[in-house]
């Protein structure tokens, strides 16, 4: 099941550095001091226009000066503040420009939090527009275990539909009481020729990890059960979302546990191991200074890499005002819910050598708490993006599983059967030809290839577009042939 995640919020960092540092044999230009006085007044009063005005002048002035501790501090703080001022003013293009300018200074100065914020803002604020062309050939083949020819899709086992090509079920490590139900679901999958993603959760998270040694009866009994389903492609997802656990563990502890589970099913030709992360990690701290990548067990133990993809209109069920809005950017909610950007790091890091699955996904139609809002249109829009843009942009992704369950204690509800517009959006988009229908051994009827500056075709062709424009509720794409408008996405 989807877990409640605890994420450490950070207070808004202040990067305003005193300009009165003493540096031997160097004096700041005389013009700096007047500009700095105006800049200080602007930042203290949160006058973003004047922060930009004075900040840009200071950046231009100091950029031509020798690089030393003082000038680097000035450039680091001013580029960050100018970027944030553009962010607050809604000028995301210039915000991205100055955040990108800030990053090398922030790294040099050890301003880790600022660098994380800046890198996320650059990813979100940079506009992207790519065109794709329909093709009959897969654009990425790994030769991996249980690799399909297209994109498998499905949902939790108790809601599965006959036309879906995979199903998702859950086991809790150490608990064999559900093995009977698991066998029943595997029997059903075998009869219907569905692939199965088994989410082997670690119920006590880090505590469970520390108690796994590979010699307990649970693992031997699990292997025995899975070995009887040789005709069912099984994706064993081991200890998922480790990077947002409340009861944390170290990378060494997790890797040891993962290897123990992976070794227990090695040699089973139908079982592929899956290492699966949450799309965004808990914030780094002195006590937990890790990224998801630190927990990777190694290629020899991992057949597939998974990542979750949950679209939520509000981060932690609240509205973030003013400068605290960076939380929405860093934790990928609201306008930052673009699924392509959400999983970008995972695909780019591992998709060159491992097939990728969206091991769980959902689009929130309901936000509880102080928000108390239902927005079916928003949820349907982002569900369609998950199921269209991800297969379009990332041929590395070969499985998408929807978490069709309602967790009453969660801030957000994602269940398809809780909202008719969301359910209809799922039904419609999963009929698309890039999904494998019914039997998991079938092939998709269509794939995507990225179009170049010139499109060559013999007869008809189908074009698709992926636009990413931060802060836009809707984007209209127009297609022209020989200067004539032939199609608009709004018509």
Name what the model sees in each region.
Residues 28-36, 117-181:
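Boundary/entry segment of secreted carbohydrate-active catalytic domains
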